[in-house]
């Protein structure tokens, strides 16, 4: 083709150059390319197992993990417990400042529920290791935080053989001489232990320890000394004035118990001679700076968890009534449960384990009479093993950062009733509504300060007090009547205007109502409550139709049965068949934790012995009341053996065994998305043993069972019910069926926020 000549655009004489695709080079940015500060932040969010896996990926990651103590201090040990092959990991994290690892190691060594130790010197070795890590865990907390490790070594102690509690006590006492920085906290813990003994000499020694601890800067010890000397200073006006000034100083320094005592004194009188307006501002500030309402994890929200929580609280109320614990123990227990669920998700099938573990902890922290671990397991119909409860106690303490006691509705209620006293029957109604409010989900009620004020407003309205919300209450709380009316009406609807939830047997859960039918509360729950329209008229608000929530239980009946039904003895993990059967030679102290009450009532039905029972110590086996012979009356009911022709049908109808569930799944396809939960509490082997099962019926009990069934060589079952109050014979045949012992994997954990800010207090 000549230059400049035209040509056609056919494919033969004209073609476009082929465009080549230029492949972009892959970016070389990876995890290793991130700045070290960002890498450290990412690694801090991993679990212990994931951290070890990442450590083995690259030498750079290995160096970062090994050289940064902050990573080990924040690594998570969620649902993990020290074992012989992982104890080194817990120890390394604890030495780097990991509170969770230190707490779990201390509890594991104390109860010998972790590393297997040699038989020689078992009590001394367990005690030394437990004291080391319990002391370490206490040192990792804020100096202003109230110490907690004393509740694990509090009496009763073992009266025969070596006691691990006594070893820990002696080791902590020796550490006071070698560690001056921890002396104040450790002396406070030792003094709290000695105060619980009946010996007068030990109580005098405890007071000397408190004085030494106060000189070392312990604010809690100073407040306890003030409480001891308060009674002797009331007679002299000058000494009483100085006493109240000292209390004001402790309150200004952040001691919450001192703040509560000071506010109550300001409400009932004016001990410092302040202006009335100044006293009102102090009390108002106490209410306005109270803790806010809690919210559960997104995984644990909805009608399902609300109903299950209602059943749990109702069952805990029954346990509190049966064991004659105070209402404060119940409120603090529910507070621990809600705060745990606020910070960490838990399988719904483990709610009962969480609840009873919180009650075991709170009784040791608040009450003189404790709920022993052995008895707590028995109250759950042996659905959980001894070690399961010990592990959950470690989880609760670590998640709550050792902060057990927080302000409750009862605390603010005491202040309100001191501001404006009411009649005794009105005070009982106030307490009744306070416990009914525990049944409400935390997402539907405000914080304890506003909630207590709303309950008092509702109480005064129901008993026709005029004015229903005086100016004195408004000035001292900072809440006007308009601020509280909405909450008061909501409480009325939830407590009195709705049908109470029912379990899968369609039995109403009325544990709180039965509790306040007692004569000690003047049978306040039997009173007729005024109607909603009349209440609106008393509160001077427009009459509106109450929005009553109707819970649809038809779609939850199958899942509710799985949640409540108790496993039969063929699927229940038996202690004698587990790997713990031969541990009698390795426990630190005697293993029996059975109270005298249980021994007297059960007799030969109990098939456990010192050789086959789980770990623990005899010093944890009975409360002070049981040692004094205060034995509650329980009824043992025998059920006649069934005929062979009817036995199979009877067991198929009443059993919640895994085999029965599998047979139902083969016959009917799964519907409604309800799936049986799988258990992952521990790695203990599950044993199966065949025995007959018998059940009793109680139309007024909670959905949880407090029944323990024991195998009988004759084929019948001996059922023991702790639900009857002492001295009251049973009127009905009891049937208490508990949920199945299964669990689902947790859906995740929200990062724990630091809520250690003290309440602000005015200083004069």
From Swiss-Prot:
It holds the Pfam family Cyclin_C. Residues 662-754 are annotated as: Disordered. A motif (Nuclear localization signal 2) lies at residues 570-575. Its main location: nucleus. Residues 583-738 are annotated as: PEST. InterPro entries: Cyclin, Cyclin-like_dom, Cyclin-like_sf, Cyclin_C-dom, Cyclin_N, Cyclins_cyclin-box, F-box-like_dom_sf, F-box_dom. Residues 702-722 have a biased composition (Polar residues). Residues 682-692 have a biased composition (Low complexity). Substrate recognition component of a SCF (SKP1-CUL1-F-box protein) E3 ubiquitin-protein ligase complex which mediates the ubiquitination and subsequent proteasomal degradation of target proteins. The SCF(CCNF) E3 ubiquitin-protein ligase complex is an integral component of the ubiquitin proteasome system (UPS) and links proteasome degradation to the cell cycle. Mediates the substrate recognition and the proteasomal degradation of various target proteins during G2 phase involved in the regulation of cell cycle progression and in the maintenance of genome stability. Component of the SCF(CCNF) complex. The nuclear localization signals mediate the localization to the nucleus. This is Cyclin-F.
């Amino acid at each position: 083709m000549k230059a400049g000549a035209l040509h056609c655009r056919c494919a033969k004489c004209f073609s476009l150059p082929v465009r080549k695709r230029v492949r972009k080079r892959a970016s070389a940015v990876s995890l290793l390319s991130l700045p070290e500060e960002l890498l450290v932040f990412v690694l801090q969010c991993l679990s212990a197992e994931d951290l070890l896996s990442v450590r083995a990926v690259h030498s750079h990651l290995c160096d970062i993990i090994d050289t940064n103590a902050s990573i080990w201090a924040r690594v998570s040990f969620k649902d993990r417990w020290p074992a012989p092959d992982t104890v080194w990991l817990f120890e390394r994290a604890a030495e780097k400042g990991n509170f969770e690892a230190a707490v779990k190691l201390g509890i594991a060594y104390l109860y010998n529920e972790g590393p297997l130790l040699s038989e020689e010197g078992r009590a001394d070795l367990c005690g030394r290791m437990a004291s080391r890590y319990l002391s370490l865990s206490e040192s990792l907390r804020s100096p202003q935080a109230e110490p907690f490790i004393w509740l694990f070594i509090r009496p009763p102690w073992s009266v025969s053989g070596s006691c691990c509690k006594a070893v820990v006590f002696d080791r902590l006492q020796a550490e006071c001489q070698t560690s001056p920085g921890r002396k104040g906290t450790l002396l406070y813990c030792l003094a709290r232990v000695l105060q619980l003994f009946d010996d007068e000499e030990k109580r005098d020694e405890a007071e000397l320890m408190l004085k030494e601890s106060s000189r070392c800067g312990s604010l809690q010890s100073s407040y306890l000394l003030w409480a001891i000397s308060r009674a002797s200073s009331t007679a002299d006006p000058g000494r009483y004035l100085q006493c109240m000034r000292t209390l004001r100083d402790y309150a200004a320094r952040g001691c919450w118990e001192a703040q509560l005592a000071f506010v109550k004194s300001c409400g009932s009188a004016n001990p410092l001679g302040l202006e009335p307006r100044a006293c009102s501002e102090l009390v108002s500030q106490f209410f306005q700076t109270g803790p806010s309402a809690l919210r559960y994890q997104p995984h644990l929200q909805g009608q399902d968890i609300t109903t299950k929580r209602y059943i749990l609280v109702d069952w805990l109320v029954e346990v509190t009534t049966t064991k004659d614990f105070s209402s404060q123990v119940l409120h603090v227990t529910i507070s621990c449960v809600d705060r745990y669920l606020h910070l960490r998700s838990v399988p719904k099938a483990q709610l009962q384990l969480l609840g009873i573990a919180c009650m075991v902890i709170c009784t040791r922290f608040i009450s003189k009479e404790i709920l022993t671990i052995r008895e707590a397991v028995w109250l759950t119909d042996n659905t959980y093993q001894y070690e399961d409860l010990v592990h959950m106690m470690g989880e609760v303490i670590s998640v709550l950062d050792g902060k057990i006691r927080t302000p409750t509705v009862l605390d603010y209620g005491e202040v309100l009733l001191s501001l404006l006293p009411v009649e005794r029957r009105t005070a009982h109604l106030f307490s009744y509504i306070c416990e009914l409010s525990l049944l409400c989900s935390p997402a539907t009620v405000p914080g304890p300060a506003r909630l207590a004020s709303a309950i008092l407003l509702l109480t005064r309205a129901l008993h026709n007090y005029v004015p229903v919300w005086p100016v004195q209450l408004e000035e001292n709380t900072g809440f006007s009547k308009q601020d509280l009316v909405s909450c008061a009406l909501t409480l009325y609807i939830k407590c009195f205007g709705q049908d109470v939830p029912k379990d899968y047997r369609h039995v109403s859960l009325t544990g709180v109502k039965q509790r306040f039918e007692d004569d000690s509360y003047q049978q306040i729950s039997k009173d007729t409550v005024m109607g909603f329209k009349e209440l609106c008229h008393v509160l001077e608000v427009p009459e509106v139709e109450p929005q009553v929530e109707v819970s649809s239980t038809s779609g939850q009946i199958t899942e509710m049965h799985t949640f409540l039904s108790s496993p039969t003895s063929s699927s229940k993990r038996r202690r004698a068949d587990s790997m713990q059967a031969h541990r009698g030679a390795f426990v630190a102290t005697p293993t029996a934790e059975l109270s005298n009450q249980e021994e007297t009532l059960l007799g030969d039905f109990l098939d456990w012995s010192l050789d086959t029972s789980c770990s623990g110590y005899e010093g944890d086996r009975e409360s002070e009341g049981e040692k004094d012979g205060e034995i509650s009356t329980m009824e043992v009911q025998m059920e006649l053996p069934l005929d062979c022709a009817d036995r199979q049908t009877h067991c198929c109808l009443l059993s919640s065994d895994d085999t029965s569930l599998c047979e139902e799944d083969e016959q009917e396809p799964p519907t409604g998305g309800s799936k049986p939960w799988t258990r992952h509490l521990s790695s203990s082997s599950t044993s199966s043993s065949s025995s007959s099962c018998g059940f009793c019926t109680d139309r007024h009990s909670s959905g949880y069972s407090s029944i323990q069934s024991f195998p009988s060589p004759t084929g019948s079952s001996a059922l023991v019910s702790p639900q009857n109050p002492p001295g009251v014979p049973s009127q009905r045949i009891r049937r208490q069926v508990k949920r199945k012992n299964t669990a689902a994997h947790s859906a995740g954990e929200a990062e724990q926020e630091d809520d250690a800010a003290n309440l602000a207090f005015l200083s004069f």
